[in-house]
């Protein structure tokens, strides 16, 4: 078996080997996650070509309305208001 000799890391110990594997795995996941979030950014381009690139189309925001319906539940006993 290949033996690695480092003064500060002894990979022949099971705990240190697990630690190094976990550290490398977490580093890989962190770095690959950073590239994925860069690709997932929303480009703020208008859907209307007359307005141009990187401009918010205000018509979209004016058409989006949030409606909150009143609750159908009754108030409990003893509650006022």
UniProtKB/Swiss-Prot annotation:
Keywords: Apoplast, Cell membrane, Cleavage on pair of basic residues, Membrane, Secreted, Signal
Motif (SxS motif essential for MIK2 binding): 71-73
Endpoints of the signal sequence: 1-40
Motif (SCOOP motif): 65-79
Any GO molecular function: receptor serine/threonine kinase binding
Top-level lineage group: Eukaryota
Location(s), subcellular: Cell membrane; Secreted, Extracellular space, Apoplast
Principal location listed in the UniProt entry: membrane
GO cellular component: apoplast; plasma membrane
The keyword Cell membrane is annotated on this UniProt entry: yes
Family: Belongs to the serine rich endogenous peptide (SCOOP) phytocytokine family.
Role description: Brassicaceae-specific phytocytokine (plant endogenous peptide released into the apoplast) perceived by MIK2 in a BAK1/SERK3 and SERK4 coreceptors-dependent manner, that modulates various physiological and antimicrobial processes including growth prevention and reactive oxygen species (ROS) response regulation.
Record's subunit section: Interacts with MIK2 (via extracellular leucine-rich repeat domain); this interaction triggers the formation of complex between MIK2 and the BAK1/SERK3 and SERK4 coreceptors, and subsequent BAK1 activation by phosphorylation.
Protein name, UniProt field: Serine rich endogenous peptide 21
Originating organism: Arabidopsis thaliana (Mouse-ear cress)
């Amino acid at each position: 078996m290949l033996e690695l000799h480092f003064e500060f890391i002894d990979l022949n110990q099971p705990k240190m080997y697990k630690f190094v594997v976990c550290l490398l795995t977490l580093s890989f996941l962190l770095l690959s996650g950073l590239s994925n979030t860069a690709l997932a950014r929303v480009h703020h381009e208008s859907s209307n070509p007359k307005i141009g690139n990187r401009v918010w189309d205000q018509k979209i925001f004016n058409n989006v309305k949030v409606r909150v319906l009143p609750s159908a539940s009754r108030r409990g006993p003893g509650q006022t208001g």
